């Protein structure tokens, strides 16, 4: 595993902007308002000539100087306590720490308080004085931070000032025995996006599977705002969870930060190998859920439906509930539906296994000769309907793509093939080649010649 460095600081010092700058992606949500980052987010930092490492962006902790450095966690409440626990976990996992302060604000009591707290960890610390852009007498402004007694660098996350030097300084904090390791394994990890309406239990499911409280869990809708990548190992295999913000109806989103989160959620689903769509069993499938599930199905995005919080449903009702979900989702009958509970861990062991199965189906490549023998069998069993006294002719079948499997039928006149018959072709291919849950595309192409075998 690659070494980790945690970005730590009070709210609105520019941690997320610096995180985005270092990983060279617009992953963390940034906004000129304290407290936008709530969960910790991880990203890969790679630069020529320097060891690669994982950077952790953490939420800002709002503390006053009267808090003790020993019993901070006991003196906090609500979100402040949850966020600080995430910061502590990030620090524990990291080999080094980057403390971020705001040059525009100057040295504040909490900066000193936090520096003292971080020193007690015994881990290497680099002080990054951010937002130095446009400040006259930069050296004089930065000088006051020397009192913290930490190695320091002045940067501007927004304008990229001294970012390369920062990368170099951060890499020097890492132990030599944990330096560069091939990242191909991580890149090849199966990526699972997890989306759904707010408070459906997405973060709870992730926490239950990986066995760590990586994400803040709350009964307040909208707790998770960023799309967060979480690498983990399950049965000696590496995976990557992408936990995204809950999706609400766009007309109800007035907060610009939350609107950004919705866009990020949909984007994450298109980039992942498999998407997990979480629904609260006590609320059922809403009209918004149906629209989004239909969108995933239309775009041929492989997904699994997770019905969470089944521990709140009576045993006799679970069978009826599963049946009702299947009836409501007749427009995508191939989608697997798993009844799970993050609280009791019921059904969670099925999620990874099903994701692997769907991914394997999506990667299926079938020989052209095998496909054409299957096509002959399919058409012999049920020929296409006659249109204007002429029965459409099928010449041959080929597979154009994988992920999702895309099959192209060459026929004499594609316009004469009905949608009903296309659905028959899809059902038949699924049955013959065991493509039970993967989305597949069926394309018809007009041709006047039968390909030479």
Swiss-Prot record:
Q: Which SUPFAM superfamilies match?
A: P-loop containing nucleoside triphosphate hydrolases (SSF52540)
Q: Name one GO biological process term.
A: ribosome biogenesis
Instruction: Pinpoint the KH-like domain residues.
Output: 364-448
The name under which this protein is listed is GTPase Der
Q: Check the record and name the CDD domains matching this protein.
A: EngA1, EngA2
**Which sites bind GTP 1?**
9-16, 57-61, 130-133
Q: Which GO terms describe its molecular function?
A: GTP binding; ribosome binding
What PANTHER family does this protein's entry cite? GTPASE DER
Identify the residues that bind GTP 2: 196-203, 243-247, 308-311
Keyword entries, A-Z? GTP-binding, Nucleotide-binding, Repeat, Ribosome biogenesis
> In what residue span(s) does the EngA-type G domain sit?
3-178, 190-363
UniProt function note: GTPase that plays an essential role in the late steps of ribosome biogenesis.
Subunit structure comment from the entry: Associates with the 50S ribosomal subunit.
The text of the family note is:
Belongs to the TRAFAC class TrmE-Era-EngA-EngB-Septin-like GTPase superfamily. EngA (Der) GTPase family.
Q: Which InterPro entries match?
A: G_ENGA, GTP-bd, GTPase_Der, KH_dom-like, KH_dom-like_a/b, P-loop_NTPase, Small_GTP-bd
